[in-house]
């Protein structure tokens, strides 16, 4: 067998759309990064596998940015998501499509994504899972910052007020202004103590601020799902 023969790798479908006649253009998450590939005969058996939250083994062919799917098989049990857990999974997928550079390996992101899907399927509380995923994604992409110290390296004061300097860190301020975080909330986030009053809502605000600059001002469609009655 040729040493250049394609090797199957683990993957999840992030998004799929019709492409030309019976094909589909599919965005995959793999340990080697986000890959885009053409899936032939998408209306057949392969098309039934090419759906979100199903662990797959996929053989990609081609050296260009747009690959071709040579082989695709199930690699485990799908995470069956319903209701807000489903919306949460779609939110994770959209985040990865928007933030993860093509063909930039991030195996830790892949592993955390798979673990988060399982936790969503088990019915675990959504907000801590989403905040943890957002935080780890930012950190793995090089956009992370400390939660227990400010941009000057000083420890976060429980009675202090802080603002986020995006991609730099937290800066203490001494005048009230919109979008601030108090020290007790930040220290609770650092310890992942979601039982602390205000910690989860503050974490949601913090992650929105941190993500906004990297989303380029375009809203996430999946966020609207949570607002529908």
Swiss-Prot record:
Keywords: DNA damage, DNA recombination, DNA repair. It comes from the Bacteria. One of its GO terms (biological process) is DNA recombination. GO terms for cellular component: bacterial nucleoid. Pfam families: RecO_C, RecO_N. Involved in DNA repair and RecF pathway recombination. Belongs to the RecO family. NCBIfam families: reco (TIGR00613). PANTHER family: DNA REPAIR PROTEIN RECO. This is DNA repair protein RecO. It comes from Pseudomonas fluorescens (strain ATCC BAA-477 / NRRL B-23932 / Pf-5).
